């Protein structure tokens, strides 16, 4: 059952980004409504990843504004943007190669934990129950992405296409309001999105 397209959830207005004398983005505007799918399409070097990096708080544009759910931000870091409900995948993978698929996807749940890091590390008190609930959420994502057979495999041992699915799983684990996908299907022969 498809959901009805809703109100504007992300509004990007007049974004310009320069690196020294090189213009990466010039006066870019668009919006995304709730339950809507949008694509930024262009050749290599057109600035697609730079645009996502501006929305995600990795880059700070010199001009323009980004409004998410009615809150305009210009100088927010990636963590603040994630706390607002924006998640993303990366063109160049940024996974923990020595950690398992399950543990990599669990990192996407980090902001959802209420207990302190110390309580989590000790599995003490409510932290143990909380981790069980977070793992159940991640297990549903692993099932959805059809990567059950690789659950305990270190990510560095997986082919690129499967690593892209793990990256998507980590972003989905954040349970985001907006999901930014940078080259989501690169290296994957099976469509999962």
Please annotate each region the language model reported:
Residues 64-73, 83-84:
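Conserved ABC transporter NBD signature motif
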Residues 56:
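Helix-to-loop junction immediately C-terminal to a conserved catalytic motif
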Residues 179-183:
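Catalytic Walker B motif of ABC-type/P-loop ATPase nucleotide-binding domains
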């Amino acid at each position: 059952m498809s959901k009805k397209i809703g109100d504007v959830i992300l509004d990007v207005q007049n974004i310009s980004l320069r690196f020294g004398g090189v213009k990466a983005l010039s006066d870019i505007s668009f919006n995304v409504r709730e339950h809507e799918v949008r694509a930024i399409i262009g050749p290599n070097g057109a600035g697609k990843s730079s645009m996502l990096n501006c929305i995600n708080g990795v880059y700070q544009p010199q001009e323009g504004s980004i409004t998410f759910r009615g809150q305009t931000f210009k100088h927010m870091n990636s963590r603040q943007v994630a706390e607002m409900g924006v998640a993303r995948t990366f063109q160049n993978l940024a996974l923990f190669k020595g950690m398992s698929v399950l543990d990599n996807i669990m990192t996407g749940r980090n902001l959802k934990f209420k207990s302190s890091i110390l309580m989590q590390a000790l599995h003490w008190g409510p932290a143990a129950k909380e981790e069980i609930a977070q793992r159940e959420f991640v297990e549903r994502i692993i099932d959805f992405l059809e990567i059950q057979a690789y659950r305990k495999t270190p990510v560095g041992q997986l082919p690129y296409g499967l690593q892209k699915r793990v990256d998507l799983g980590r972003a989905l684990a954040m349970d985001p309001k907006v999901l930014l996908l940078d080259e989501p299907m690169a290296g994957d022969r099976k469509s999962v999105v």
